[in-house]
């Protein structure tokens, strides 16, 4: 009886969670993630190149963002600037879609049957849970993206090219490194869920406080300019707090260097480069992720409101 009771309560809990699932959030999140990454992929490439720049001789030396972009353009043209774009778009679209999908379901589940709004810590935990669930699915795509972006001899049709595309990379990593290879950087990636958690917490609170400030309903839809402002502020806050983990993660996923684990990366980076090593690439990262975040959130908010309104009209 006890086992049946636990089983019944467990299935009841799951059915309650799934009652809050809205596929509109998934579609809207995918739309925002894909559009923002297609527009700003070259800056993501620059960020990755700078993040792993640790003095290794085989790597090109870059003097700044513009020098990096022009060097890649001269060597490989537009295709070089969009190296790794396929897994990036797949990964970003899927990640944002799943993140918004899980986050809104968790948030709705937690607010069911209560009059008061969620506390800041509840937004934080909900976003962290959504981020961890998303990473379990998407980590192999991020490893693939990093490997493709770090092929420095990526001349078209080059016989020296290690990976030929997204699926070739996935197959080769699995063949030579197994599942463990596909989940390199997973631990710092889990820590990275704190970035999304902080961002979503700040985003929710800023929207709420802003609507209260101008005497609007808490859930009132914002204008495009207002969404951009709130998204930009929340992203800058999150980046400033969590950037070092991205450097650690990128170095773990880099095929040109071998590290035994997270502690090894942190120790070697600190010894060779000091605190600055953990913030390499932050300038191109901020330049890229702030507008990318704004595009993602503006597209998400507008598409989700449109789709959810359609759902209501069909009832």
Swiss-Prot record:
Keywords: Membrane, Mitochondrion, Mitochondrion inner membrane, Repeat, Transmembrane, Transmembrane helix, Transport. It is found in: Mitochondrion inner membrane. It is a multi-pass membrane protein. The chain crosses the membrane at residues 26-43, 89-106, 123-143, 186-203, 227-243, 281-300. Its main location: mitochondrion. It holds the Pfam family Mito_carr. One of its GO terms (cellular component) is mitochondrial inner membrane. One of its GO terms (biological process) is mitochondrial FAD transmembrane transport. InterPro entries: Mit_carrier (IPR002067), Mitochondrial_sb/sol_carrier (IPR018108), Mt_carrier_dom_sf (IPR023395), SLC25A32-like (IPR044712). Solcar repeats lie at residues 20-109, 118-209, 222-306. It comes from the Eukaryota. GO terms for molecular function: FAD transmembrane transporter activity. It catalyses: FAD(in) = FAD(out). Facilitates flavin adenine dinucleotide (FAD) translocation across the mitochondrial inner membrane into the mitochondrial matrix where it acts as a redox cofactor to assist flavoenzyme activities in fundamental metabolic processes including fatty acid beta-oxidation, amino acid and choline metabolism as well as mitochondrial electron transportation. In particular, provides FAD to DLD dehydrogenase of the glycine cleavage system, part of mitochondrial one-carbon metabolic pathway involved in neural tube closure in early embryogenesis. Belongs to the mitochondrial carrier (TC 2.A.29) family. This is Solute carrier family 25 member 32. It comes from Macaca fascicularis (Crab-eating macaque). The lineage of its organism: Eukaryota, Metazoa, Chordata, Craniata, Vertebrata. The gene is SLC25A32.
